[in-house]
Design a protein with these regions (language model features):
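Catalytic cores and adjacent binding grooves of peptidoglycan-active enzymes
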Residues: 9, 13-14, 162, 169-244
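N-terminal Lys/Arg-rich, disordered targeting/topogenic segments
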Residues: 1-5
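Active-site-adjacent substructure of cysteine-protease-like catalytic cores
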Residues: 134-168
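Active-site acidic/histidine clusters and adjacent loop/turn architecture
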Residues: 53-143
């Protein structure tokens, strides 16, 4: 019994020391985004807890709006919408032109929940554009999508859980257009044989995993062979996350 107590005490002490070392490291590095209790700032590069902080914006529309405005993201607030018992949104926005974003979404009539919009802005600045410059020497000018809001259950589960699309907390990304009109498609280029296109798509998928609760790609199943599903599921700041 004494040996067990000594082992338990030693383990807890070691964990406390590791936690203290981590806090010191993050503080000295000047990266508050790597700490779970610091405030989210969209001007900061993504950190270890950025994705969880974005998910924590679900059901906190005023805080999400304040962050978007401070970051220079222009948008229009959509009227609250209710579509039956399980569908609708109270934090819907539509991106507006200008401001700190430079990417157009096609089609332009994209209704998304505010936490999804915040995640997309960070994705553009810190993942998509750097990857495009690295692989093609050009910026992305537009991102094509299959939409966000859709009052439905998860595909393939007729009687199962409701999709995050039912509350505009998800978006399906299908392609990227570069400044020279080059089009990079998830369906055609995920395994299309062009190393640069394949590497770009995998890089933006993996980067999205740091910013969204669930990210599904062609690696997940056939239903996602032509798009990336990216959502901000309402699991809070410490809930389960998934990336495929």
């Amino acid at each position: 019994m004494r040996a067990l107590r000594r082992w338990t005490f030693g383990t807890l002490a070691a964990l406390a020391m590791l936690a203290g070392a981590f806090v010191l490291w993050a503080t000295l590095k000047g990266r508050p985004q790597d700490l779970p209790w610091t405030e989210l700032d969209l001007a900061d590069p993504p950190g270890l807890f950025t994705g969880r902080k974005l998910a924590g914006l679900t059901h906190d529309f005023p805080r999400c709006e304040a962050l978007m405005k401070r970051a220079g993201v222009r948008y229009t607030v959509l009227p609250e919408m209710r579509d039956g018992e399980h569908c609708g949104y109270a934090d819907g926005v539509r991106f507006a032109g200008g401001g700190s974003r430079r990417v157009d979404y096609l089609p332009a009539d994209l209704r998304i929940a505010c936490p999804v919009a915040a995640g997309l802005a960070l994705w553009e600045w810190n993942v998509v554009q750097p990857a495009a410059i690295r692989h093609f020497g050009k910026r992305v000018s537009a991102i094509e999508h299959y939409g966000s809001y859709s009052c439905r259950r998860i595909v393939g589960r007729g009687n199962g859980n409701w999709s995050q699309h039912a509350t505009a907390d998800a978006i399906d990304i299908r392609a990227f257009r570069l400044a020279d009109a080059t089009r990079i498609s998830v369906k055609q280029d995920w395994k299309g044989g062009d190393p640069a296109r394949e590497a770009f798509l995998r890089e933006v998928r993996t980067g999205a995993c740091r910013l969204f609760t669930i990210v599904l790609s062609p690696d997940y199943n056939e239903a996602h062979a032509d798009h990336f599903h990216m959502d901000q599921s309402a699991r809070g700041e410490f809930g389960w996350r998934g990336c495929w």
